[in-house]
From Swiss-Prot:
The name this protein goes by in its record: 3-isopropylmalate dehydratase small subunit
Pathway where it operates: Amino-acid biosynthesis; L-leucine biosynthesis; L-leucine from 3-methyl-2-oxobutanoate: step 2/4
GO MF terms held by the record: 3-isopropylmalate dehydratase activity
Keywords, comma-separated and alphabetical: Amino-acid biosynthesis, Branched-chain amino acid biosynthesis, Leucine biosynthesis, Lyase
EC number of this enzyme: 4.2.1.33
Organism field: Francisella tularensis subsp. holarctica (strain LVS)
Function comment: Catalyzes the isomerization between 2-isopropylmalate and 3-isopropylmalate, via the formation of 2-isopropylmaleate.
Quaternary assembly: Heterodimer of LeuC and LeuD.
Annotated catalysed reactions: (2R,3S)-3-isopropylmalate = (2S)-2-isopropylmalate
Superkingdom of origin: Bacteria
């Protein structure tokens, strides 16, 4: 997993609520046996239906931040949705709320999800309609800076530490293997 500390990027405005995992990556693209190759299918059905869909706009092709509406990532628990987003270059999603399962899948795969109040998210989304608008995400300080304003966000301290150091669950366990072995030995008596 790639470490994340600070990011400055333009943002993709997607002011839709209840974006479910099937919208993010349709089920017919889940036939692979590897974790790779999902990014090209991100929002496939929405891109096909609407040529003006924001993910069809080349002005946002290098954007690493996505701004969305309430309840992002709802629906099934497919981890493929997170893989598709990260493989498409998305490193941060800002929304008023996220599905719990999606939130956990994102944290385990290095995708930073930031919840801000709905009015703030809508304001940022409106500003992101200009592809030149950029913002800075500072995970260490837990701030979003945009257009002269700074917004603070909460983030789980354990997940924050793992993301800053680039540790997925397995790497974290390996890093603490000696402590785990000592504990196991002490339990055996």
């Amino acid at each position: 997993m790639q470490a994340f500390k600070k990011l400055t990027s333009s943002a993709i405005p997607l002011w839709l609520s209840d974006i479910d995992t099937d919208m993010i990556i349709p089920a017919n693209f889940l036939t692979q046996t590897t974790k790779d190759g999902y990014g090209k299918s991100l929002f496939h059905n929405l891109k096909e239906k609407d040529s003006s869909f924001v993910f069809n706009n080349p002005d946002y092709s290098n954007s690493e931040i996505l701004i969305a509406g309430d309840n992002f990532g709802c629906g099934s628990s497919r981890e493929h949705a997170v893989w598709a987003l990260t493989q498409a270059g998305i490193k941060v999603i800002i929304a008023p709320s996220f599905s719990d399962i999606f939130f956990n899948n994102a944290a385990k795969n290095g995708l930073l999800l930031i919840s801000l109040d709905k009015d703030t998210v809508k304001e940022l989304c409106d500003k992101a309609e200009d592809p030149k608008f950029s913002m800075t995400i500072d995970l260490q300080e837990q701030t979003v800076s945009a257009d002269g304003s700074i917004y603070s966000f909460d983030y789980d301290p354990f997940r924050k530490d793992c993301l800053i150091r680039g540790l997925d669950d397995m790497t974290y366990l390996i890093e603490h293997l000696d402590i785990i072995k000592q504990f196991e030995q002490s339990q055996r008596g």
